[in-house]
Regions:
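NAD(P)+-binding Rossmann beta1-loop-alpha1 motif at the extreme N-terminus of oxidoreductases
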Residues: 1-45
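Rossmann-like NAD(P)-binding element
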Residues: 47-49, 54-86, 90-96
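General beta-strand structural signal in soluble alpha/beta enzymes
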Residues: 52, 116-122, 167-169
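Short, conserved loop/helix-junction motifs that constitute active-site signature segments
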Residues: 79-84, 111-112, 135-136
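Active-site-lining helix/loop region of Rossmann-like oxidoreductase modules
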Residues: 128, 141-197
Length: 197
């Protein structure tokens, strides 16, 4: 399992995912379209374990988070080589464009052919994702889906280590339909409370 998490996109979602990975004890390389030099303040705020990188360097990590607006995804990942990396699809297609009956995660999987896509972190707001997942004595719930069991296991461990309670929704199509922006789990913020004795 990779200890390095690459993040493509340094906005609110990218920074929230960086905080989550750091909380889980991972190292983070974060990138944006303007280059590493523009990320000094972001990296300083994230603290130890975080560094700035180019998008291609972030894409070479064992786990890669796509955290850019959906309409910018093709440009953000164009030309990268995908060879077994785990790609976390944290995007949402807010414009609900014509996906021809497919989920946005299926389309992303086509763009990163050779990678193993796991859909997660898109049903919570960036602010909630970045906050302490232990609430009211329980654990914040995060959903994921994907077609590769080992990839889902590695991503589950990342979120478990960060303090979340992970629920696996199954394959990318089934889970993706529930997680996408007009699906039943979009915007749902649940906390798993401990069972009483």
């Amino acid at each position: 399992m990779s200890r390095l998490v690459g993040i493509i996109g340094a906005g609110r979602l990218g920074q929230a995912m960086a905080r989550t990975a750091l909380r889980a004890g991972r190292h983070v390389v974060i990138s944006n379209s303007r280059g590493p030099g523009s990320l000094a303040s972001v990296v300083s705020e994230l603290g130890a374990g975080a560094s700035a990188a180019t998008a291609s360097q972030a894409a070479a990590a064992g786990i890669v988070v796509i955290a850019v607006p959906w309409d910018r995804v093709p440009e953000a990942i164009e030309g990268f080589e995908w060879d077994g990396q785990i790609v976390i699809d944290a995007t949402n297609d807010f414009d609900a464009g014509d996906l021809r009956g497919r989920t946005s995660s299926e389309l992303l999987a086509d763009l990163v052919a050779g990678a193993r896509v796991v859909k997660t972190a898109n049903t919570l707001t960036a602010a909630v994702l970045a906050s302490d997942p232990h609430e009211a004595g329980g654990q914040r719930v995060i959903f994921l889906s994907g077609d590769d069991d080992q990839a889902k296991s590695d991503v589950s461990k990342l979120f478990n280590d960060a303090g979340f309670f992970v629920i696996d929704l199954g394959d990318l199509i089934t889970g993706g339909q529930m997680q996408q922006i007009h699906g039943p789990l979009a915007g749902v913020n649940l906390v798993r409370l401990p069972m009483g004795n």
